[in-house]
């Protein structure tokens, strides 16, 4: 005899095999079991407070839910496709354990508000883990910057050598981008920190549900304002996926730089062997696979965001079965963000820099041409447009003759313009001087780098406090 569905009273026929296969979500939403049990325990306590359950009944339900958690933890729990999802799987097992008492648990609750609460609890829990990983990455960026305040590397625009920068400036540029990522992930935590239980299917519930008790017991910051909004929106998932997509764009751009800068054509950086792989046919190869894989995963995470946006855009209020698909991109993104953050951290820690190769590229790329033009303006009183033209002629001559600004003979410089033979020429094209002339707030000058590192340390202290707030706001998730 087929097992009757928990919602089957209205139906004469059981769902077809196809309906069961297309409708099941237990193959993926079992990820929520801890949070579903956590919410159910709080719900049972609330039912006791309002007189639906006796104290003895509530204790039995809580004990039963604890046993189910142990069964799932140990791998002994049998997930059945016929039970559709994690909510029905747990309730069905609870009914096996407790008989009709298990059927009382769903009083004053719909799967619509139940799943919405589960996902919020899941996001809160995972945000804590992700924020710790991003924080660790920030400390590595800062440590790398501190070690390379005097190392000069090329800065690029249009993938053409533009101006010299201190390597610390480069590493700090990624530090500040990831600071914003941390803050956006923190904001995603706050968006999920909400009680939606008590919203029912969409209109609320017919019982005197004590939502304030539920909020406190689940350690949530606030209650949802509108039951229809609570069960039909997925902004809490959007918020996380937006933050994740931005993080992965930042990560992918860094990975692209690693791929370029570790190639033979650049050779500014070198990755340690344990973060690279070889070729099955070419024995000389040392491939930056971690960087390439993370770059590829960026498209995957952005695709997860697109998946959810497109899925939701055509659905009327309130709940629709389409929403079952919201968890696949969520779970996958959590997994990808965690492993990619670790990968970026390990690459940053392991990068070896070759300043001599960077210097060669800076010289060959005429990276201080702008500084030379500015020197003609400030020291020699030449109008900027005229100075720009003089230096442009000099660069063209060097390119044709195989010189750079450092190797072209004084006599040949004088053929272009007499001012280029001035003794101040050498200082004007100095790589270090070029960096230190950028003595503005946020610039690459050495004093400004030291200031920026100090501010970065202060920012880390600020983020440390936010991590502690997360720990105090987070539920113990059973």
Swiss-Prot record:
One GO cellular component term? cytosol
> What name does this protein carry?
Argininosuccinate lyase
E.C. code: 4.3.2.1
Return the NCBIfam families for the record: argH
Q: Where in the cell is it found?
A: Cytoplasm
Any single biological process term in GO: L-arginine biosynthetic process
Looking up Gene3D superfamilies in the UniProt record yields: Fumarase/aspartase (C-terminal domain), Fumarase/aspartase (Central domain), Fumarase/aspartase (N-terminal domain)
Reaction it catalyzes = 2-(N(omega)-L-arginino)succinate = fumarate + L-arginine
Family under the similarity heading: Belongs to the lyase 1 family. Argininosuccinate lyase subfamily.
Report the main location listed first in the record. cytoplasm
Q: Which UniProt keywords apply?
A: Amino-acid biosynthesis, Arginine biosynthesis, Cytoplasm, Lyase
A single Pfam family it belongs to is Lyase_1
Pathway noted in the entry: Amino-acid biosynthesis; L-arginine biosynthesis; L-arginine from L-ornithine and carbamoyl phosphate: step 3/3
| Keyword flag Glycoprotein | no
Can you name one GO molecular function term for this protein? argininosuccinate lyase activity
């Amino acid at each position: 005899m087929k097992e009757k569905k928990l919602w089957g009273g209205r139906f004469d026929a059981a769902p077809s095999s196809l309906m069961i296969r297309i409708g099941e979500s237990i193959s993926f939403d079992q990820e929520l079991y801890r949070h579903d049990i956590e919410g159910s325990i709080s719900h049972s306590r609330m039912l006791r407070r309002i007189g639906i359950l006796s104290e003895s009944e509530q204790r039995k339900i809580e004990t039963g839910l604890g046993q189910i958690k142990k069964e799932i933890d140990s791998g002994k729990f049998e997930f059945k496709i016929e039970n559709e999802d994690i909510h029905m799987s747990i309730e069905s097992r609870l009914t096996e354990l407790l008989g009709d008492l298990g059927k009382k648990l769903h009083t004053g609750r719909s799967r619509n508000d139940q799943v919405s609460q589960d996902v919020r609890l899941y996001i809160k829990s995972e945000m804590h883990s992700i924020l710790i990983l991003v924080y660790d990455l920030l400390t590595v960026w800062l440590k790398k910057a501190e070690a390379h305040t005097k190392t000069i590397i090329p800065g690029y625009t249009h993938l053409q050598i533009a101006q010299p920068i201190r390597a610390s400036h480069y590493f700090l540029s990624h530090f500040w981008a990831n600071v914003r990522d941390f803050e956006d992930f923190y904001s995603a935590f706050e968006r999920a920190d909400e009680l939606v239980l008590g919203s029912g299917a969409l209109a609320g519930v017919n019982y005197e549900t004590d939502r304030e008790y539920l909020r406190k017991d689940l350690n949530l910051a606030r209650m949802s304002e509108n039951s229809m909004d609570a069960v039909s929106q997925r902004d809490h998932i959007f918020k996380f996926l937006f933050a994740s997509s931005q993080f992965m764009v930042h990560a992918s751009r860094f990975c692209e730089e690693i791929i370029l800068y570790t190639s033979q054509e650049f050779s500014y950086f070198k990755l340690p062997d344990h973060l690279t792989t070889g070729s099955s046919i070419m024995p000389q190869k040392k491939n930056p696979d971690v960087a390439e894989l993370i770059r590829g995963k960026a498209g995957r995470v952005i695709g997860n965001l697109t998946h959810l946006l497109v899925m939701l855009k055509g659905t009327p209020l309130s709940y629709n079965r389409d929403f079952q698909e919201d968890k696949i991109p969520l779970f996958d993104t959590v997994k990808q963000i965690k492993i990619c953050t670790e990968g970026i951290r390990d690459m940053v820690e392991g990068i070896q820099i070759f300043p001599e190769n960077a210097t060669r590229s800076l010289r060959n790329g005429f990276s201080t041409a702008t500084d030379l033009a500015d020197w003609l303006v400030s020291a020699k009183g030449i109008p900027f447009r005229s100075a720009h033209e003089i230096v442009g002629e000099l660069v063209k001559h060097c390119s044709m003759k195989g010189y750079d600004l450092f190797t072209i003979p004084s006599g040949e410089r004088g053929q272009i313009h007499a001012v280029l033979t001035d003794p101040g020429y050498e200082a004007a094209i100095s790589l270090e001087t070029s960096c230190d002339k950028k003595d503005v707030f946020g610039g690459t000058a050495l004093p400004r780098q030291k200031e920026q590192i100090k501010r970065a340390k202060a920012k880390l202290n600020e983020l440390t406090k936010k991590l502690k707030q997360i720990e105090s706001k987070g539920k113990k998730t059973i």
